[in-house]
Amino acid sequence: MTIQYTFSMIKPDAIKRNKIGQVNTYLENAGLKIVAQKMKFLTKYEAECFYDEHRARPFFNSLVEYITSGAVVLQVLKGEDAIILNRTIMGATNPAEAEAGTIRKDLGESIEANSIHGSDSENSAKREIEFFFNKSEIIE
Protein backbone atom coordinates (compact mmCIF):
# COMPACT_ATOMS: atom_id res chain seq x y z
CA MET A 1 0.00 0.00 0.00
CA THR A 2 1.15 3.49 -0.84
CA ILE A 3 0.42 6.79 0.89
CA GLN A 4 -1.21 9.03 -1.70
CA TYR A 5 -2.85 12.41 -2.01
CA THR A 6 -6.07 12.90 -3.91
CA PHE A 7 -8.45 15.72 -4.69
CA SER A 8 -12.10 15.87 -3.70
CA MET A 9 -14.77 18.47 -4.34
CA ILE A 10 -18.07 18.58 -2.47
CA LYS A 11 -20.54 19.83 -5.07
CA PRO A 12 -23.18 22.58 -4.83
CA ASP A 13 -26.10 20.19 -4.29
CA ALA A 14 -24.52 18.82 -1.10
CA ILE A 15 -23.52 22.30 0.11
CA LYS A 16 -27.08 23.61 -0.38
CA ARG A 17 -28.42 20.69 1.68
CA ASN A 18 -25.86 21.28 4.47
CA LYS A 19 -24.07 17.94 3.95
CA ILE A 20 -20.41 19.05 4.29
CA GLY A 21 -19.99 17.46 7.71
CA GLN A 22 -21.70 14.27 6.63
CA VAL A 23 -19.47 13.95 3.54
CA ASN A 24 -16.37 14.59 5.67
CA THR A 25 -17.50 11.88 8.09
CA TYR A 26 -17.73 9.35 5.23
CA LEU A 27 -14.22 10.31 4.08
CA GLU A 28 -12.68 10.18 7.55
CA ASN A 29 -14.44 6.94 8.50
CA ALA A 30 -12.99 5.40 5.33
CA GLY A 31 -9.49 6.21 6.61
CA LEU A 32 -8.80 9.38 4.63
CA LYS A 33 -7.27 12.42 6.31
CA ILE A 34 -8.39 15.88 5.17
CA VAL A 35 -5.11 17.83 4.89
CA ALA A 36 -6.55 20.88 3.09
CA GLN A 37 -10.07 22.23 2.72
CA LYS A 38 -11.61 25.47 1.52
CA MET A 39 -14.98 26.70 0.34
CA LYS A 40 -15.40 28.94 -2.68
CA PHE A 41 -17.55 29.85 -5.64
CA LEU A 42 -15.93 28.74 -8.89
CA THR A 43 -15.92 31.24 -11.72
CA LYS A 44 -17.09 30.09 -15.13
CA TYR A 45 -13.50 30.33 -16.33
CA GLU A 46 -12.20 28.17 -13.45
CA ALA A 47 -14.90 25.57 -14.08
CA GLU A 48 -14.18 25.48 -17.82
CA CYS A 49 -10.46 25.05 -17.19
CA PHE A 50 -10.98 22.44 -14.48
CA TYR A 51 -13.31 20.35 -16.66
CA ASP A 52 -11.43 21.05 -19.91
CA GLU A 53 -11.06 17.32 -20.66
CA HIS A 54 -14.87 17.19 -21.05
CA ARG A 55 -15.12 20.27 -23.32
CA ALA A 56 -16.14 18.26 -26.41
CA ARG A 57 -18.79 16.26 -24.57
CA PRO A 58 -22.47 17.19 -24.85
CA PHE A 59 -22.84 17.68 -21.07
CA PHE A 60 -19.95 20.19 -20.75
CA ASN A 61 -22.04 23.38 -20.68
CA SER A 62 -24.57 22.01 -18.19
CA LEU A 63 -21.71 20.72 -16.01
CA VAL A 64 -20.08 24.17 -15.94
CA GLU A 65 -23.45 25.80 -15.22
CA TYR A 66 -24.15 23.35 -12.40
CA ILE A 67 -20.72 23.53 -10.73
CA THR A 68 -20.89 27.35 -10.72
CA SER A 69 -24.47 27.41 -9.37
CA GLY A 70 -23.32 27.51 -5.76
CA ALA A 71 -20.37 27.11 -3.45
CA VAL A 72 -18.12 24.06 -3.53
CA VAL A 73 -15.73 22.66 -0.93
CA LEU A 74 -12.30 21.81 -2.30
CA GLN A 75 -10.23 19.22 -0.45
CA VAL A 76 -6.91 17.43 -0.46
CA LEU A 77 -7.15 13.98 1.07
CA LYS A 78 -4.29 11.77 2.23
CA GLY A 79 -4.18 8.08 3.01
CA GLU A 80 -3.12 4.62 1.98
CA ASP A 81 -4.20 4.16 -1.65
CA ALA A 82 -6.21 7.38 -1.22
CA ILE A 83 -7.30 7.62 -4.86
CA ILE A 84 -9.02 4.25 -5.03
CA LEU A 85 -10.26 4.54 -1.44
CA ASN A 86 -11.90 7.88 -2.22
CA ARG A 87 -13.41 6.51 -5.46
CA THR A 88 -14.80 3.54 -3.52
CA ILE A 89 -16.45 5.60 -0.76
CA MET A 90 -17.84 8.03 -3.36
CA GLY A 91 -19.63 5.25 -5.25
CA ALA A 92 -20.75 5.06 -8.87
CA THR A 93 -21.34 8.33 -10.73
CA ASN A 94 -25.05 7.59 -11.00
CA PRO A 95 -26.49 7.48 -7.45
CA ALA A 96 -29.12 4.97 -8.61
CA GLU A 97 -26.31 2.53 -9.49
CA ALA A 98 -24.06 3.24 -6.48
CA GLU A 99 -23.65 0.73 -3.68
CA ALA A 100 -25.43 1.31 -0.37
CA GLY A 101 -23.29 3.12 2.16
CA THR A 102 -21.49 5.26 -0.42
CA ILE A 103 -21.67 9.05 -0.55
CA ARG A 104 -23.41 9.16 -3.92
CA LYS A 105 -25.98 6.48 -3.04
CA ASP A 106 -26.82 8.04 0.31
CA LEU A 107 -26.55 11.74 -0.58
CA GLY A 108 -26.58 12.08 -4.38
CA GLU A 109 -29.63 13.32 -6.26
CA SER A 110 -28.72 12.65 -9.92
CA ILE A 111 -25.76 11.88 -12.17
CA GLU A 112 -24.81 15.57 -12.19
CA ALA A 113 -25.90 16.46 -8.65
CA ASN A 114 -24.16 13.45 -7.11
CA SER A 115 -22.64 15.41 -4.20
CA ILE A 116 -18.93 14.78 -4.81
CA HIS A 117 -16.12 14.73 -7.36
CA GLY A 118 -12.88 12.82 -6.85
CA SER A 119 -9.70 12.34 -8.84
CA ASP A 120 -9.64 9.16 -10.94
CA SER A 121 -5.86 8.72 -11.27
CA GLU A 122 -2.52 9.89 -9.89
CA ASN A 123 -2.12 12.30 -12.82
CA SER A 124 -5.60 13.74 -12.28
CA ALA A 125 -5.00 14.07 -8.54
CA LYS A 126 -1.77 15.98 -9.10
CA ARG A 127 -3.35 18.28 -11.69
CA GLU A 128 -6.51 18.92 -9.66
CA ILE A 129 -4.68 19.56 -6.39
CA GLU A 130 -2.27 21.97 -8.09
CA PHE A 131 -5.17 23.70 -9.84
CA PHE A 132 -6.72 24.80 -6.53
CA PHE A 133 -4.05 24.57 -3.82
CA ASN A 134 -0.59 25.95 -3.08
CA LYS A 135 1.75 23.62 -1.18
CA SER A 136 1.56 25.98 1.81
CA GLU A 137 -2.19 25.30 2.11
CA ILE A 138 -1.69 21.56 2.63
CA ILE A 139 -1.23 20.87 6.34
CA GLU A 140 0.08 17.45 7.31
Curated annotation (Swiss-Prot):
Q: What is its EC number?
A: 2.7.4.6
Catalytic residues of the enzyme: H117
User: Cross-referenced Pfam families, in alphabetical order?
Assistant: NDK
Q: Which SUPFAM superfamilies match?
A: Nucleoside diphosphate kinase, NDK (SSF54919)
CDD domains cross-referenced by the UniProt entry: NDPk_I (cd04413)
Task: Please state where this protein is localized.
Answer: Cytoplasm
Q: Which residues bind ATP?
A: K11, F59, R87, T93, R104, N114
Family annotation (InterPro entries) = NDK-like_dom, NDK-like_dom_sf, Nucleoside_diP_kinase, Nucleoside_diP_kinase_AS
Output a single Gene Ontology CC term carried by this record.
cytoplasm
Q: SMART domains of this UniProt entry?
A: NDK
Q: Which GO terms describe its biological process?
A: CTP biosynthetic process; GTP biosynthetic process; UTP biosynthetic process
Q: List the disulfide bonds.
A: none
| Complexes and interactors | Homotetramer.
**Cross-referenced PANTHER family:** NUCLEOSIDE DIPHOSPHATE KINASE, NUCLEOSIDE DIPHOSPHATE KINASE DDB_G0292928-RELATED
Function per UniProt: Major role in the synthesis of nucleoside triphosphates other than ATP. The ATP gamma phosphate is transferred to the NDP beta phosphate via a ping-pong mechanism, using a phosphorylated active-site intermediate.
Q: Which HAMAP family match?
A: NDP_kinase
Family, similarity comment: Belongs to the NDK family.
Name under which the protein is recorded: Nucleoside diphosphate kinase
Organism annotation:
Rickettsia felis (strain ATCC VR-1525 / URRWXCal2)
